[in-house]
Amino acid sequence: MAKLLLHTCCAPCLIYPLKRLSEQGFEVTAYFYNPNIHPYGEYKARREATERYSQDAGVEAIFPDYRPEEYFQAVHLREANPGRCVTCWTLRLAKTAREAKDNGFTHFTSTLLVSPYQDQNALRLIGGDTAKSVGLQFHYEDFRPGFRKAHDEARAAGIYCQKYCGCIFSELERYGKDKSNIGHKVTTSQGHKL
């Protein structure tokens, strides 16, 4: 059975990818690495929900220390969207890939692929490039068809469901009035145009 490390952004987004990957025969471990989530109370709510869901689902989960400085150092001078998002995805997928490589996993992927609000093409490219750099397989699958049902299931079960992606900038975009940075194109460090 192939071992897969699943970067996990939150409990609701874990539900469908975990089901699909388990059906495909992967031995899945969740990896909750999200230094982008702010404020700390929001991080704590998402982590606790992920801990509870992981226990209930019988899936092993790893929770590295919360280090928001890693996120801020990475996105410094890249605060405009989507440059900051590409940098954030790269940070989290690279950390997941290194953790997978160091601990005997053969594959990695992310629950970010379930969200209709994330850039699938960018995530696929970043995951593929990261996999090549560490010598692992990136499992790309468009999990979006299960997004709504999983989030409905989470709400019905009383699982905490957040209202923004996670970072302070996405919170401002969600609740603030200035939407001028949304939709600008960027180029990744590997030269992919997004």
Predicted regions and their residues:
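Nucleotide-activated chemistry modules centered on ATP-dependent adenylation/adenylyltransferase
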Residues: M1-L194
